[in-house]
Amino acid sequence: AVHGDARGYFMETYNEREMKEAGFDIQFVQDNQSMSTKGVLRGLHFQKNFPQCKLVRAVRGEVFDVAVDLRSNSETYGKWYGVILSSENKKQFLIPEGFAHGFLVLSDEAEFCYKVNDFWHPNDEDGMAWNDPEIGIEWPEVVGEYKGSASAEGYALKDGTRLNLSDKDQMWSGMKLSLIHISEPTRPRLI
């Protein structure tokens, strides 16, 4: 909950007891923060053998945040969930293990924070194309035409800002849905 008055606001961003009462017994081990400029698209990332649960939020600016279900035993396998996270709406998005994750920066700049329940394992990192037509993510403000690769070439935001992906994010060649399995399906949730 956000408690505000004329002086500003106070917001509790994580409460272990309340998470457990809601059915989430998650032990977070690391907090991360990134800053990105408008048009940057990070993702879609996942770890195959060390899947991460993430609790994400934008502390400055606005992003469109996406989770894609990679659990082959799930009823929602291959489906995506997207939500606007911003410093204005103060929403958080809980992404369970077994999902690919990414976000697109919609504001001039955005600072993005996330808690994870496992450490980064560089040799286990993998990804998938942000524009895979089988998934069909409806990225807001993005215009362009699918050219059969994960490249950002030919894509921009409606205001003309070029879409900006890292070299690594451009090399992901497609969906790898069968790589991650978790035992109990859990849907991403706004909290």
Predicted regions and their residues:
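Short alpha-helical functional segments enriched in proximate histidine and acidic residues
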Residues: 102
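Non-catalytic, conserved peripheral segments adjacent to functional cores
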Residues: 1-91, 107-109, 116-179, 183, ...
